[in-house]
Amino acid sequence: MSWQAYVDDHLMCDIEGHEDHRLTAAAIVGHDGSVWAQSATFPQFKPEEMNGIMTDFNEPGHLAPTGLHLGGTKYMVIQGEAGAVIRGKKGSGGITIKKTGQALVFGIYEEPVTPGQCNMVVERLGDYLLEQGM
């Protein structure tokens, strides 16, 4: 399966039990910031934004004072799982980022999608990739 198929079929899909509820944008990005696959709606990000995200995975709490920035959008960092998941909130939407051995799985959402639904979609794919040694 291509990386694009993972984004299209497992991240940008209808959320279980909620037809027409899907993430706003999604991507799979290597730890080095190289995009493996992304939705057409995923924001263009700056290298320093990706560096900040990677630093927060290695030093949990790094982004808390300044917020998480992606594509020029600032998210308030909320509770995640140290070294494994970063979650952010902005207005009625937010972001979930799951770290795997080689990649970061991104999901961005807006209402009516809930934070929990975004977490489920992103973390399920991230856990699968971890099981596959990715």
Swiss-Prot record:
Q: How is it modified after translation?
A: Phosphorylated by MAP kinases.
Q: Which SUPFAM superfamilies match?
A: Profilin (actin-binding protein)
Where can the motif Involved in PIP2 interaction be found?
Answer: 84-100
Cellular location(s): Cytoplasm, Cytoskeleton
GO CC terms, sorted? cell cortex; cytoskeleton
- Keywords (A to Z) from UniProt: Actin-binding, Allergen, Cytoplasm, Cytoskeleton, Disulfide bond, Phosphoprotein
Pfam families given for it?
Answer: Profilin (PF00235)
**Superkingdom of the source species:** Eukaryota
Family matches, as PANTHER family: PROFILIN (PTHR11604), PROFILIN-5 (PTHR11604:SF25)
Q: Main role?
A: Binds to actin and affects the structure of the cytoskeleton. At high concentrations, profilin prevents the polymerization of actin, whereas it enhances it at low concentrations.
User: Subunit notes for this chain?
Assistant: Occurs in many kinds of cells as a complex with monomeric actin in a 1:1 ratio.
Which named protein is this? Answer: Profilin-1
Protein species of origin: Olea europaea
